[in-house]
Amino acid sequence: MINKKRLINTFKTLVQIDSISLKEGQMMAYLIKELKKLGYKPYFTAKPEGGEVGNLMVDVPGQGPVVMLNAHVDTVGHSRKIKPVEKNGYIVSGSNTILGSDNKAGVAAILEILKTIKEKRLAHPAMQIVFTVAEEIGLVGARVIPKNKLKAKFGIALDGGDINEIVNQAPSQINLKAVIIGKAAHAGIHPEDGINAIQTASEAIAKMKLGRIDKETTANIGIIKGGRARNIIPDKVSLEGEARSHNPKKLARQIKHMARSIEEKCKAKNAKCKIKTQKIYTSFEVKENHSLIQAAKGALKSTGIKPMIKSTGGGSDANIFNAIGIPTIIMGVGADHVHTAKERLPINDFVKGTEIVLELLKILTPVYAMFPPPLHFQWRGGSRIVLPCAPSPSKMEKGRRA
């Protein structure tokens, strides 16, 4: 039903517009132009500190409670212009850099869905489109959206890979930053007068439990900086790390363990330390029996794909939306090997993933929901009930005559 060629061309256009985090102005200008062509009135919300623009939102009138479609428009940094090329059924980068399918694929899918709905005059739910900025640097854009600007009852974040997956769980994350202060000295003449901050940091890290802690928890030290010259005992080192967990008690315990490892080693070495921790986002779980997940499963099945409910170890805008009370799932559009020069977008999956989301919107439309396979949704007293099947037209007709 969607226009495959147009979808692919839109994606290729998007990835050639640079939009690294906090520098998404050109991308938003393009989206505003495209949305206005469709007759919509896009508007900005508050922008994050240091950003060129804020998040872009569009209200799409429709039937029933508001459904949010979300995709972030920023990418990780890259040193070369992205040149998309088609090769063996994939879109890849022809310039030895990232492709930008994370998350230009999601953005392109939303644009194509809006265009298809307009062209074919399809029934659809009321929607709020939310294009966020600065997702790649800690969900910064989504975090500054005023809660009263978000009108959706539930949401769909297009920010995944495999198109058969419905992501309904993600962890909390706490970041850790530490500065270790030692004492400088000449490394060849008076090394005993110094306190080696790098050595202290190394021994502290060696004490930490890192990597996969258990099935719910991970931890990492990802950045270490320090030292001025090879012949000077380093007097200052900075560390940056993180811990993630689906379990809040485990997360608190892990980040405390990492901080204590630094403190204890600094005490043993007569060094000083300053440690800061910051919660970046909160874990979420949308229960598998939630009507949104049931609808997503129905959309996948109706397009011939076996759905898989999945937990992820990464964070996304969905964490922010769930935290403020909007049940939001993550659905994939095919992105593969993201954030690397090997990144690629399988064309068939990209097209199919977009069609699945369009099918999901049909299922979420009250008028369409009267006659779908395989699920029927009915409103009673302000809540949604999932029924095993729709009433037959003949029975409905008899009911009307009665």
Question: Language-model segments: which ranges?
Answer:
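N-terminal capping segment at the start of a domain
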Residues: 1-25, 279, 336-340
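Zn-dependent metallopeptidase/amidohydrolase metal-coordination segment
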Residues: 7, 224, 235, 305-367
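A non-catalytic alpha/beta surface segment that caps or lines the substrate-entry region
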Residues: 20-65
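Active-site metal-coordination/substrate-binding segment of hydrolases
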Residues: 28, 64-126, 131, 136, ...
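Midchain, well-structured core segments that form catalytic/ion-binding scaffolds
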Residues: 80-82, 87-97, 134-267, 273-282, ...
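Phosphate-handling active-site elements
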Residues: 115-128, 208-217, 367-368
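Short, low-order "capping/linker" segments at domain edges
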Residues: 284-298
